[in-house]
Amino acid sequence: MEAPTDKVIDSAPEAAAGAWRLVADVGGTNARFAVASNEGSISLVTRYSVDQHPSIEQAVSAFLDELAPHGYSGTPDAACFALAGPIEGDEVRFTNSTWVASRSRLSRALGGSAVDFLNDFAAIGHAIPHLESSDWIQMGGGASRVDYPIVVLGPGTGLGVCLSLIHI
C-alpha cells in the first residue's frame, strides 16, 4: 500500500491520559481520519485515497497503526463517521465508492468501541453554529441575514447539500 496522501501531525496531549476518540470524514474519493479531544480539538489528521484500501475497516486499521508512534495505543473510546451516502440502518453504501460501512463491523474492528454514523453534509449542518464569523464567505449580492436558514452545497465526488435551520 502506498503512504497516505496527506498528514497533519500535531501534539497529542490526550494520549498520555489513555482516552481518545476517532472521527472520520469518508467520501467516494478520500477518507480522512483524526483524533478528537474532549474539548473538541482535532489532531493527527490523516487522509487516504479510498482506492488505497479495499475496505473502510482496513483504512481504519492503517490509521490506528499510524497513531502508535504518537502515544495512542489500543482503540478509541468512541468513533463518529461522517459518510457520503444515505444513513439507513447498520450499513451505509457509499454513493460513489464500493466501500460499505457497517456500524457493527467497525465496532468490532475498534475493539467494541461505540460507533456512530451521520451523513457528511448533516455533519456540516451540525458544525455551522460553531463557526466563527471569519469562517464565513458572503456570496452574491446584499448582506447576510442572521435569522435566515443556511444552505451549504459542496461538489466532491458527488454533490452534497445541507439545509441548516439553525440561525446564527
Region spans (language model):
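Conserved phosphate-binding catalytic cores of ATP/NTP-utilizing and phosphoryl-transfer enzymes
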Residues: 3-16, 117-150
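Short glycine-rich, Thr/Ser-proximal phosphate-binding strand/loop in the N-terminal lobe
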Residues: 12, 16-62
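Short amphipathic alpha-helices and their capping/turn segments at secondary-structure boundaries
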Residues: 60-72
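Short beta-strand-loop/turn "lid" adjacent to the catalytic site in phosphate-handling enzymes
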Residues: 70-117, 122, 126-135, 152
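Extended, Lys/Arg-enriched charged tracts that mediate electrostatic binding to polyanionic substrates
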Residues: 156
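Active-site histidine-anchored catalytic micro-motif
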Residues: 159-161
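Conserved small/polar residues in nucleotide/adenosyl-binding loops
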Residues: 166-168
